[in-house]
Amino acid sequence: MQPPAALDRSPGLDKQSIVSAALDIIAERGVAGLSMRLLSQRLGVALGATYRHVPNKNELLRLVAADLYARITPADDTHGDEFDQAKHVMLQIHDVLAAYPGMAAHIAQNIPEFASAHLTKLITDPLQAAGLSADEAGRIVFTLILLNAGHMLIRVPAGLEDEAAAAFEEGVDLILRGAQTRSQHR
């Protein structure tokens, strides 16, 4: 007879397959369209099997966020100065989250639970290398998160997507160049 733990698992079901299916659903339907029931149906398993791996939707979204965060790569000298490097990382974050409707807003609404020290460092390290204090760099990251979440919440009218994307990029640039200018006048 198998031990109870062995009976609890559906063959082939693991956290990564659950996260992958959740990402597919979010890409199609947004965060609001994701449910544990739909996820279980998509995976072809009983609802209880999914819950044995992931206890609730919020934990699932934390795992999804971690998967998305892992896609962000650090900038290097080929991306320009330190402010350009921070911008490069922020634009990656934006683009990754944009493919999954509702994730940026969910993350912004739950910042303490969804904060990523790794992502924060990808932006703050270049800013601190440029001479900003840790507090200033942290404030800039928070401002960029708010800008990103706000941009993701707005339903851009058809035909204005490129203009909205350009405005977002310009906003990131304005925030970072403003910080650069301020740091040079101390």
Please place each PLM-identified region on the residue numbering:
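Basic, helix-initiating cap at the start of DNA-binding domains
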Residues: M1-R42, V54-R62
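Short, basic, alpha-helical segments at the C-terminal edge of helix-turn-helix-like DNA-binding modules
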Residues: A66-R71
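Hydrophobic alpha-helical connector segments
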Residues: T73-Q109, A115, A134, V141-L144
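Hydrophobic alpha-helical bundle segments that form small-molecule/ligand-binding pockets
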Residues: L119-E161, A179-S183
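Key DNA-contact positions within bacterial/archaeal DNA-binding proteins
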Residues: R37, A46-A49
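Residues in the recognition helix of alpha-helical DNA-binding motifs
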Residues: H53-V54, I140
